[in-house]
Amino acid sequence: TTWASSTTDQVTVTSAAKSSTAKKVDLRKAINQTPTTAAATANIPAPIYHGEAMVLIHADNNEVLLSHNATERLNPASTTKVVTLLTTLLRDGTHLDTLANITPYAASMEPSVLGVRAGDQVPLIDVAEGMMVSSGNDAAVVLAQNVSGSIPAFARAMNETAKLAGATDSNFLNPHGLTEAGHYTTALDLAHIAAYGMRIPMFRDLVADEYFTVPYQNRAPETVHTTNFFIRSHYPGANGLKTGYTEAAGECLIASATRGGQTLIVVLLNDDFRWDDAPKLLDYGFKRLGIT
């Protein structure tokens, strides 16, 4: 389906490196939530785009610049991992610098994997970064089991995190996004969650990599490359975020870019032309803000 739509007008972290030496910090208290506003430029034609649902927002104040079916409940596929990452960073008692306990169940996950093995020695923060780069379902389960003890407990924490970030109609049942009855979100909720995360420097750092070398302590390091062609395309200002695909969800993408100090986020759900649509929609958004 092709859509052409009219416009809809309407965290700073204390020094903590994304490594095994990272210090535990209270990320929620460190978030700078002061919105940045910018006057929208009128009379700019919206681009033609595709997909079942879409929303384009100004990440600094959550202003919706363009949307289509943005509140429709849909399968999010691996865009779920944005919530998994945010929950891992915000959950009380999480020690990101400690070695993860990797169970046989986590290591058995398919089909997109980081490649961890049961008993591997690698810090939790590096599992999180590897998850975002490789879209590893195994890494997502490792995070869930280490942060909350079980997938059901972590899913409850994910839903708390989503609400904290401004989501109003989402229900997450697993950390990886594989299809499960009752696991759903909306494009608008994903945009709000991503925008909340992008106010946290550590989150921003972990969602922007083209590749990452996993520093296993018990075997040779392994390098994984991003599944996100939007990041690899070097779109001007591109700095995240996450891909997703399952047969039920179709092709999904959360893409973010920052120009002139302004960050925009576009969410595309079930969009076979996501790599073409994301740059066009972001270009439109920056023009709306008077940024080229």
Model segments located where?
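Active-site-adjacent loops and short helices of periplasmic peptidoglycan-processing enzymes
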Residues: 3, 9-18, 22-188, 192-201, ...
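Domain-terminus/edge residues, biased toward the C-terminal soluble/receptor-binding domains
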Residues: 168, 179-292
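Alpha-helix capping and helix-coil boundary motifs
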Residues: 1, 93-95, 273, 285-286
